[in-house]
């Protein structure tokens, strides 16, 4: 399957724990917890089979520590797991461990690291351990937990994307429901601004200090729901084509030109945006399922708010809102105790563990059988982020490094300065496809057209 790089970003599991979870790239905020945190038990007899599990996650460290201790105390195979919680140095430490004899037995993998770890040879396939029941229970996701027909991890939780809106400001403006089209988005932002401007409230904002982050949680998901690849890649033709973004970027520009966008978005980062929203100064923005935890803990909301599906270009859903995730634990290729390591992994993937994981608010399950029985976490606003029939996992697109300005920067420049958007898009298509051709010729990147690709078929796998 063609490759596409999934954005990592904050997710519910980050925010609900009041800390960013990081396997290095894209998820900062962790500090190393010494050299490790061993949870030991006294089960079994004779010499222990000692294995280690390395993770960069801090948000769920206490939960995982409890489960490690439970496994150590209850397993009858004499296996003892040491939990090692790293911080921002996770990737570097893992690289160094594979150059020595200190590599872990089990590795925390994410959508933004599993491909790299696979290519570096850090991971061992787990197919020999998978029963037919496990294969049916845990979805296979090519390029996310499956490579060249072999499984390297199983899913646990995922991240959804939604429109976050200020219900109080909506009521003040007399607006009954969130926008479902781009034109409604523009009109709603204008009405919200008219109702709130006297109090310093504006209809719309995104964290445009980083155009990639801002558009990656807004324009991207609007495009995906409308049937276009969220990063400009067309899976049917195996070429880059940003033309689907034209109405989206024009709508954002119109909101700014109307004066409906919070002043100063050019320098607005995500946390200052959240702080403003919590105070009631923003009517709408788009983001990940991290937001409920943020407004419970980091920036307690002083307003009534909710989340809804993002609008599409014309009100018709022709694709799927990206559901990010698909992996959790990986088996180290250097482990000398792979069977013991798998028994620990199998324990962590038991229904009760995964159900507890969601119900305690660490993440939204991507395992259908768990989603069907797990209770909704007691966190205000989370219900709007739970999987719906329009959430789906997009294939991975090929990573390229175009010369010149990246697409997000080019789009934001147009939003600020105007110009010819069609010409901007034509230039992006030319440069991105040149970079793609170079990557195919020189770097072994694969990009094959799939004329039968149907973005609408991606949804409906996690909820009906």
Name each model-derived stretch.
Residues 7, 22-114, 177, 340, ...:
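Conserved N-terminal structural module of periplasmic/extracytoplasmic solute-binding proteins
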